[in-house]
Swiss-Prot record:
It comes from Helicobacter pylori (strain HPAG1). The keyword Endoplasmic reticulum does not apply. Keywords: Amino-acid biosynthesis, Aromatic amino acid biosynthesis, Cobalt, Cytoplasm, Lyase, Metal-binding, NAD, Nucleotide-binding, Zinc. Pathway: Metabolic intermediate biosynthesis; chorismate biosynthesis; chorismate from D-erythrose 4-phosphate and phosphoenolpyruvate: step 2/7. Belongs to the sugar phosphate cyclases superfamily. Dehydroquinate synthase family. This is 3-dehydroquinate synthase. SUPFAM superfamilies: Dehydroquinate synthase-like. Its cofactor is Co(2+); Zn(2+); NAD(+). Binds 1 divalent metal cation per subunit. Can use either Co(2+) or Zn(2+).
Length: 343
């Protein structure tokens, strides 16, 4: 079992990578999962969990269910089983479940503890660590939420064996995101090695990158913004396609390519570096066809990004391999020229 300590000012916790251990709790626990994950992995968790009382809340699977209705269902279950401030919520699932349960636990009784047990690659390397929680709204993705850290995160690679290839590759997109912005050595690992042979090592490296970033910038004031590479465009794509056509990681892969187009036009990437990222995405089947139907509408949607302020879009753009820059005040014509390529 490998461990990563994330020491923060208000709350420190550990990320455990290895076989899920026995979890013994002296308080009540509400497990929240989705309809697919519960069928695959709930019994595995229940065999390892001992608590004063256990209840299970199952939410429909999918990004479009990351909403107020699902949040209300979670909270109603918490009230019905009379959870108190010492009780726990347990998130068993991917990024959607992790985000919703984190948010629910942050607002129930003004905050109770929760444990993350991520079951997808994307959730293991990204969503379950760092304390970003939230739900989607008709106006955009993750626009309502909070920063709220878990009590612990347990990552068991056995969960990944049931992932479809598409789900797995979506998680790789988030690994590439972190590698391009923070660690050129990880980029080289992804380029030269078979991921099957070094999966645990790559997950550990990815979580460690995110842990270091979160330790420096828990509330996303500066360096943590690098974790949003590809997300300004990616979130707009998800909203434009009603969260149904692409998985989150797939939309981020497209968003990274759009960001790369912008970085290339601004001279932040050389053509060689641009092609290197493109080839890495190709290696993991992360090149998708996407066509913007209404460029002006898509452009306006970019302003709904949480990083935007004073009617200015902030873009996270790669600056070579292994570094990034937050760029704002880019002329509208420059952005529209990039979007034209996708029209």
């Amino acid at each position: 079992m490998q461990e990563i300590l994330i020491p923060l000012k208000e709350k420190s916790y550990k990320v455990f990578l290895g076989e899920l251990p026995k979890i013994e709790l002296k308080q009540k626990a509400l497990i929240i999962s989705d309809s697919i994950v519960a069928g695959l992995h709930l019994s595995y968790l229940l065999k390892r969990l001992k608590a004063l009382e256990v209840r299970v809340c199952v939410i429909e699977s999918g990004e479009k269910y990351k909403n107020f209705h699902s949040l209300e269902r979670i909270l109603n279950n918490a009230f019905e089983m009379q959870l108190n401030r010492h009780s726990l919520m347990i998130a068993l699932g991917g990024g959607v479940i992790s985000d919703m349960v984190g948010f629910a636990s942050s607002i129930y009784f003004r905050g109770i503890g929760f444990i993350n047990i991520p079951t997808t690659l994307l959730a293991q390397v990204d969503a379950s660590v760092g304390g970003k929680t939230g739900i989607n709204t008709p106006y955009g993705k993750n626009l309502i939420g909070s920063f709220y850290q878990p009590k612990a995160v347990y990552m068991d690679l056995v969960f990944l064996k049931t992932l479809e290839k598409r789900e797995f590759q979506a998680g790789v997109a988030e690994i590439i995101k972190m590698a391009v912005c923070f660690d050129k050595n990880l980029v080289e690992t992804l380029e030269t090695k078979d991921l099957k042979d070094c999966l645990e090592e790559v997950i550990f490296q990815s979580v460690n990158i995110k842990a270091q970033v979160v330790m420096q910038d828990e509330k996303e004031q500066n360096i943590r913004a690098g974790l949003n590479y590809g997300h300004t465009f990616g979130h707009a794509i998800e909203k434009e396609t009603d969260y149904e056509r692409f998985l989150h990681g797939e939309a981020i892969a497209i968003g990274m390519r759009m960001a790369n187009d912008l970085a290339l036009s601004l001279g932040m990437l050389t053509l060689k570096e641009y092609e290197r990222i493109e080839n890495l995405l190709k290696k993991f089947d992360l090149i998708f066809h996407y066509k913007i139907t209404d460029i002006q509408k898509f452009y306006e949607r970019l302003f709904l990004d949480k990083k935007s302020e004073n009617k200015t879009i902030k873009f996270i753009l790669p600056k070579g391999i292994g570094a990034f820059e937050i760029v704002s005040h880019i002329p509208k014509e420059t952005i529209l020229k990039v979007l034209e390529k996708w029209h």
